[in-house]
């Protein structure tokens, strides 16, 4: 029998983490993160990582599992997440996957054709050298020429994902977008996914929440977090330091831009990222959208989502 899994997706700053905890409390669940930046240790503020207090005793998995200079592939995520789902299910609990990284979500619910693809560390190092010499835009243009479809979904500064897409093309002869489409045709029969999407009818409300979150990150010592990462020995080329919110602070610390400019760049980049996330999740035809601004308050939103899930789950 297929394992029922609840997936809570949506753009950054939409309230997914809080909702996941409430759903877990209601249905005896445990939570698996699907966030490609929260896998990294020592990066709490800039990734808006859930705190121990906010977890309210609910077990959370795939958070704080790798060093900031380590690579963590979709294949590795898929392997670990599926093992954890099985374990949660065996213990009679509900697996809840929460996050905004579309490829991580896909690796669970679809049969991914490129998930076993390991690639080449040598190739990745070579690409990083090119990026250091000519800038990330150089690699982005390269990707646009071989896989324009994938390039549309990847930010020009997201070196990690640009290199991954180039690597898949280099070693399989087919663009990564081809495999993503292929995977979309076949849902994984091991699971019965029940997907909740959080969104806003008024996009400006989401953008205001993003701006507020970035301001809070600065108040909560994001700059100090980046300084500490650099002190430990991680540099601007470390895998995780390429992330939105970190690379801009590194630019500020190097005197290339002011703090105000760094904050504005983070806000703008995050708003763009949220827009791309919404586009991605709209591609799931089985998603049930809940618009946060349709409800008087969070309690009313939560009540409606729990009612919807109660009608779907065998729990």
Swiss-Prot record:
EC number: 2.5.1.75
Site note Interaction with substrate tRNA, residues: 101, 124
Example GO biological process: tRNA modification
Binding, substrate: 12-17
CC cofactor: Mg(2+)
Pfam family name, one: IPPT
Annotated positions binding ATP: 10-17
Record keywords, A-Z: ATP-binding, Magnesium, Nucleotide-binding, Transferase, tRNA processing
First-level EC class: transferase
GO MF terms, alphabetically ordered: ATP binding; tRNA dimethylallyltransferase activity
Region (Interaction with substrate tRNA): 35-38
Reactions that this protein is recorded to catalyse: adenosine(37) in tRNA + dimethylallyl diphosphate = N(6)-dimethylallyladenosine(37) in tRNA + diphosphate
Family per record: Belongs to the IPP transferase family.
Self-association state and partner proteins as the record states: Monomer.
Record function comment: Catalyzes the transfer of a dimethylallyl group onto the adenine at position 37 in tRNAs that read codons beginning with uridine, leading to the formation of N6-(dimethylallyl)adenosine (i(6)A).
Record-linked HAMAP family: IPP_trans (MF_00185)
NCBIfam families attached to this UniProt entry: miaA
This protein's name: tRNA dimethylallyltransferase
Annotated organism of origin: Thermoanaerobacter pseudethanolicus (strain ATCC 33223 / 39E) (Clostridium thermohydrosulfuricum)
GN (gene name): miaA
């Amino acid at each position: 029998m297929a394992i029922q899994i609840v997936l809570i997706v949506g753009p950054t700053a939409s309230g997914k983490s809080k909702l996941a905890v409430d759903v877990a409390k209601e249905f005896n669940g445990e939570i698996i993160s699907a966030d490609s930046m929260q896998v990294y240790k020592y990066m709490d503020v800039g990734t808006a990582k859930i705190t121990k207090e906010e977890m309210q005793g609910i077990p959370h998995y795939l958070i704080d599992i790798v060093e900031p200079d380590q690579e963590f592939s979709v294949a590795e995520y898929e392997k670990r997440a599926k093992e954890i789902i099985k374990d949660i299910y065996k213990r009679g609990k509900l697996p809840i996957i929460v996050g905004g990284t579309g490829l991580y979500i896909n690796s669970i619910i679809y049969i991914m054709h490129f998930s076993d693809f390991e690639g080449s560390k040598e190739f990745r190092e070579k690409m990083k050298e090119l990026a250091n010499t000519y800038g990330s835009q150089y690699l982005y243009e390269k990707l646009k020429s071989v896989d324009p479809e994938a390039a549309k979904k990847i930010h020009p500064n997201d070196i990690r994902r640009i290199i991954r897409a180039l690597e898949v093309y280099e070693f399989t002869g087919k663009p990564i977008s081809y495999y993503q489409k292929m995977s979309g045709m076949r849902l994984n029969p091991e699971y019965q996914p029940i997907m909740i999407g959080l969104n806003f009818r008024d996009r400006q409300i989401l953008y205001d929440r993003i701006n507020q979150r970035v301001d809070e990150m600065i108040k909560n010592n994001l700059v100090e977090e980046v300084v500490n990462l650099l002190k430990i020995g991680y540099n601007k080329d470390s895998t995780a330091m390429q992330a939105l919110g970190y690379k801009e602070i590194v630019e500020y610390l190097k005197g290339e831009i002011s703090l105000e400019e760094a904050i504005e760049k983070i806000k703008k980049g995050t708003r763009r990222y949220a827009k791309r996330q919404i586009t991605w999740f709209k591609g799931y035809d089985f998603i049930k959208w809940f618009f946060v601004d349709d409800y008087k308050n969070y309690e009313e939103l939560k009540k409606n989502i729990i009612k919807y899930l109660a009608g779907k789950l065998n729990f």
